[in-house]
C-alpha cells in the first residue's frame, strides 16, 4: 500500500551494460567558474553548459497502465512500455533477456518487439498458459 518504488533487478554475465533512456525536460544553459583551490586552472573565465533538455531518469519511472482493471491478466502486470524501456537500457539487439517471474509475459512481448531472445519462467500453470497465448497472438 502507498508504495512508490518497486525493485527491478538486472543481472548479466559481465559488468553491467547501461544505455541511458533519457527523458525530455526544459532546455537550459548554465555558466560556472572552476574553483582555483582544487587546482583547476583551465576555464577560469567560466564554462558554459548547454543542454537541449534531456535528463537522466530518476528513481521513479512513470508508465501508466494501458488496460482496464477487468482486462488485467495478472495481479502485478506491468505496462509493455516499461518493459521496453528497461530492455533498451540494459541490453542490445539479439541479447538474451530472462524473466524468472513472467506472469502475463509483458517482458516477452517487449523482447519480441525489440529483437531480443527471451527466456521466461512461471510456476503457475494458468498464468503460463495465458502468457504463452499472449506472446503467440
Mark where each language-model region is.
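Core catalytic lobe of class I
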Residues: 1-130
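Short, conserved SAM-binding/catalytic segment
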Residues: 132-137
Amino acid at each position: 500500500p502507498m508504495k512508490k518504488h518497486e525493485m527491478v533487478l538486472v543481472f548479466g554475465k559481465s559488468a553491467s551494460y547501461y544505455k541511458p533512456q533519457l527523458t525530455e525536460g526544459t532546455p537550459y544553459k548554465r555558466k560556472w567558474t572552476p574553483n582555483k583551490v582544487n587546482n583547476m586552472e583551465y576555464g577560469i573565465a567560466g564554462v558554459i553548459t548547454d543542454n537541449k533538455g534531456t535528463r537522466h531518469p530518476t528513481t521513479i519511472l512513470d508508465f501508466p497502465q494501458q488496460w482496464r482493471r477487468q482486462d488485467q491478466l495478472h495481479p502485478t502486470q506491468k505496462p509493455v512500455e516499461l518493459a521496453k524501456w528497461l530492455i533498451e537500457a540494459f541490453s542490445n539487439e539479439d541479447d538474451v533477456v530472462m524473466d524468472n517471474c513472467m506472469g502475463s509475459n509483458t517482458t516477452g512481448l517487449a523482447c519480441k518487439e525489440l529483437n531480443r531472445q527471451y527466456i521466461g519462467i512461471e510456476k503457475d500453470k494458468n498464468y503460463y498458459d495465458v502468457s504463452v497465448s499472449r506472446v503467440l497472438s
